[in-house]
């Protein structure tokens, strides 16, 4: 059994780390590089950086901070935001990122996934899926441009159909962002993640909902995800990563030591 990953998520806007609730009302958390260093030293297994307005602004992720992060941390990190070509991806990877993640650009151009995987290898191509549960239709639906509340829009894709599609195109990992749970700290959407796990043959990362230390053990044991991404509980010091890993070990969940 591979060790389960603990992944702090840093949403970036205008050069600062921010955090919202259900992708809205973002507050400033702090500067990117010191936070990245802090999490690496605390025992995080990986970091994810989302330039949350890049796609909706029609630009590529602000690259000015990527190389600075690579200089101060020694754990893998993934960068996302408006990456829509092989050249965009190459620049970010050359600056020191270990993975790149695409979301809205993949919805516009699904074959981008295959082109990136062919050039850089499947292992470093992550596809983010922003999924919203519609209670009226009882469906999980894919959304795009979620970093900008004025431009956020539903796509025509069912969440699980889209996951199957991107895996078939060469995605090496899926991050499932459960929008209903984002920032509210009520637990991961276990039911949605279980359904996604059944459709996903590559590593699956849960995102959205972590509020207590037990939420992490629940998502690993019940949904069989490979990693859990969280923001608020780490940014606000609610759950120290060291304590989380000790607890998971006690629950017989394999994690890397801090």
Curated annotation (Swiss-Prot):
UniProt EC number: 4.3.2.10
Active site: 11, 130
Pathway: Amino-acid biosynthesis; L-histidine biosynthesis; L-histidine from 5-phospho-alpha-D-ribose 1-diphosphate: step 5/9
Entries under SUPFAM superfamilies matching the protein: Ribulose-phoshate binding barrel
Top enzyme category: lyase
Main location: cytoplasm
Catalytic activity: 5-[(5-phospho-1-deoxy-D-ribulos-1-ylimino)methylamino]-1-(5-phospho-beta-D-ribosyl)imidazole-4-carboxamide + L-glutamine = D-erythro-1-(imidazol-4-yl)glycerol 3-phosphate + 5-amino-1-(5-phospho-beta-D-ribosyl)imidazole-4-carboxamide + L-glutamate + H(+)
Keyword Lyase: yes
Coiled coil: none
One GO CC annotation: cytoplasm
Subunit and interaction comment: Heterodimer of HisH and HisF.
Name of the protein in its database record: Imidazole glycerol phosphate synthase subunit HisF
Species this protein is from: Colwellia psychrerythraea (strain 34H / ATCC BAA-681)
Gene symbol of the encoding locus: hisF
């Amino acid at each position: 059994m591979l060790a389960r990953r603990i992944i702090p998520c840093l949403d970036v806007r205008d050069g600062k780390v921010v955090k919202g609730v259900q992708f809205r009302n973002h507050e400033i958390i702090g500067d990117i590089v010191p936070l990245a260093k802090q999490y690496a030293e605390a025992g995080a297994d990986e970091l994810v950086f989302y330039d949350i307005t890049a796609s909706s602004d029609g630009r590529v992720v602000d690259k000015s901070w990527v190389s600075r992060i690579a200089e101060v941390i020694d754990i893998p990190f993934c960068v996302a935001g408006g990456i829509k070509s092989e050249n965009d991806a190459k620049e970010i990877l050359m600056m020191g990122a270990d993975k790149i993640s695409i979301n809205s650009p993949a919805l516009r151009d699904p074959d981008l996934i295959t082109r990136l995987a062919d050039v850089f290898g499947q292992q470093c191509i992550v596809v983010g899926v922003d999924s919203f549960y519609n209670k009226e239709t009882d469906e999980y639906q894919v959304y795009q441009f979620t970093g900008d509340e004025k431009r956020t829009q539903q796509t025509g894709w069912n969440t699980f159909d889209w996951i199957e599609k991107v895996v078939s195109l060469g995605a090496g990992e899926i991050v499932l962002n459960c929008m209903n749970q984002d920032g509210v700290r009520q637990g991961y959407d276990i039911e949605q993640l279980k359904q996604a796990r059944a459709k996903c043959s590559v590593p699956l990362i849960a995102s959205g909902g972590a509020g207590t230390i037990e939420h992490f053990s629940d998502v690993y044991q019940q949904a069989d995800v490979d990693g859990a991404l969280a923001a608020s509980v780490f940014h606000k010091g609610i759950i120290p990563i060291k304590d989380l890993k000790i607890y998971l070990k006690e629950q017989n969940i394999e994690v890397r030591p801090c």
